């Protein structure tokens, strides 16, 4: 799997992104069960992983003075974390309707396969890049200039879709907590991480 002969370009996110912007607002006490679907940065750390199509939170759109939205295919980054390994955690939004995006989230628009980008941004190498130069403190921050420097492999859209299809199957096994003991689920998670890194390891950087 790793080292496969596939045409690939290694590109910075700054080269593939078509737009960047930050979310705004949506305090904890402004989250409700009704209203427009929304996402807060903490949910990227605790609730969503790789991709999601529905929000667990909503808010009253009319009460948000500064409105920022995400649409189908956007990549969302949490730019604040308490731990360096989790700084810049990202998730792809693949739902049909626009959602409101809270503060400490950066939205990246692009023309690639959103699931592929999210898998590529979760690899061991990408996580190390996100944390590069960060110093442990009570709260760790990153920003758009730093995110733009992250380098990931970009094969053809057809190859991106092929890789995503394989990883979706492995990833589904790690999230199905209804089957298997905790030890089995942990083994599946390690297997998924292994194949993810292998599939996203190409022979050489261009």
Please place each PLM-identified region on the residue numbering:
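Sequence-specific dsDNA recognition surfaces
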Residues: 14-27, 43-72
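Short, structured motif recognition centered on aromatic/hydrophobic residues
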Residues: 8-13, 36, 70, 74-76, ...
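A short beta-sheet element
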Residues: 40, 65-124
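Non-catalytic DNA-recognition/assembly elements of restriction-modification systems
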Residues: 2-23, 184, 190, 195
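A short glycine-rich beta-alpha junction/loop motif
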Residues: 98-104, 135-156
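Short, conserved secondary-structure segments in the cores of folded domains
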Residues: 4, 27-28, 66, 96
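Short amphipathic alpha-helical linker/capping segments at the junctions of internal repeats
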Residues: 95-99, 171, 181-197
């Amino acid at each position: 799997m790793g080292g496969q002969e596939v045409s690939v370009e290694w590109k910075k996110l700054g080269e593939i992104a078509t737009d960047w912007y930050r979310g705004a607002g949506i305090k904890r006490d402004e989250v409700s069960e009704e209203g427009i679907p929304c996402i807060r940065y903490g949910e990227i750390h605790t609730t969503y992983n790789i991709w999601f199509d529905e929000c667990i939170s909503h808010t009253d759109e009319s009460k948000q003075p500064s409105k920022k939205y995400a649409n189908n295919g956007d990549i969302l980054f949490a730019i604040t974390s308490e731990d360096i390994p989790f700084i810049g955690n990202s998730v792809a939004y693949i739902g049909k309707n626009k959602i409101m995006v809270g503060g400490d989230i950066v939205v990246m628009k692009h023309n690639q396969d959103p699931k592929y980008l999210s898998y590529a941004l979760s690899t061991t190498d990408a996580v190390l890049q996100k944390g590069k130069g960060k110093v442990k403190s009570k709260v760790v921050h990153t920003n758009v200039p730093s995110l733009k420097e992250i380098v990931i492999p970009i094969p053809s859209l057809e190859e991106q879709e092929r890789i995503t299809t394989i990883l979706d199957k492995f990833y589904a096994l790690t999230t199905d907590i209804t089957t298997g003991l905790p030890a089995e689920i942990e083994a599946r998670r390690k297997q998924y991480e292994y194949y993810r890194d292998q599939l996203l390891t190409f022979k050489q950087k261009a």
